[in-house]
Amino acid sequence: MTDAPDGPAPDVLAGPVPDALPRRRGRAWALAAVGVVAAPPVGGGAVLLTRPAAPAATALELAGDLRTHDPALVVGDEGEPWYVFSTGDVRVGLGAPQIRRSTDGGRTWEEVGTVWEAGTRPRWVYDAVPGVENFWAPEVVEHDGTWYLYYAASTFGSNRSVIGLMTNTTLDPDDPAYAWVDRGEVISSTPGEDNWNAIDAGVVDVDGTPWMAFGSFWGGIQLVELAWPDGTLADPDAEPVTIASRIGSPNAIEAPYLAERDGWYYLFVSRDSCCQGSDSTYNMAVGRSRDVTGPYVDREGRDLAAGGGEPLLATRGDVVGPGGQSYSKGYLAFHWYDAAEGGDFRLGIRELAWDDEGWPVATTREEQAQDAG
């Protein structure tokens, strides 16, 4: 894998300063990138002092079956398995969401099945979305001992889409009680009637009330209130609220994911073009709010509903088009395209760092050094 664990930041900077920078400014700028600052001269000489390096994410070095799109990560408790649910493959399990498991803390992954097979598939979905072949972008959340799996049914280029729901009492496929139960439709969108697209669910629980973000292109990212224990809409007649948009056509924003940390609600989104292999331009951005309903703003105070967004992770080297993200217990999961392997898709997982202002950092120390020049 190209994402490797980070080593410590160097104590001093070696190598030439880029010619494009003024020599004095260039040295100070480059030293600051690795946590080194120059003190005023004392007794005729400069003294180099170290300061804590900027926060950096840790990329897990992954192995095993990593061919996933739109991973929904579930980080297990200590000693327990981790799971990733991802977009289905039409050739496997009738295109149902795929399931992978790790028993070594999220580093080695094996495929352990699909959410349904021929005898258990939700047949109503095929009537709701004619032509659907595989099922996209699952989301998995737990409430009161029940696991809720949200999935999307759609076809490329259309907003005739539906988000469906299945539940289970366990994620362990080896448990005798393991069985996914169809709970029907959560929300749908219809061409010519709805200016949003019912795919890409992301759910967060706020003091016992679940909220679901969803959306792709069209009118951008929407938010609706759900209700436990059903896990469906609290008010089927309520209109979704727009919480993120690129404003202009084609409004290339999707894959919302909501997470709470230290009194802030964070909205992670993917922007631009997915699923083009090495030509993908996917990238991730984030905003935050004190209220789950928004407004979500970036570091500069720009509203995500008005085109704002704090950059989080983008193409670097052979890691192309990272996006389709989820978040679980401090870890960010996403897919990316490996330019060194012909643009094949891969799973990525990073333990996020957080800066002094409470913003997530997804870049590694190595990437930050490369960005610094």
What are these regions (language model features)?
Residues M1-W29:
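Terminal targeting segments of Actinobacterial cell-envelope proteins
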Residues P16, P22, A54-G373:
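Carbohydrate-active catalytic/glycan-binding domains of CAZyme proteins
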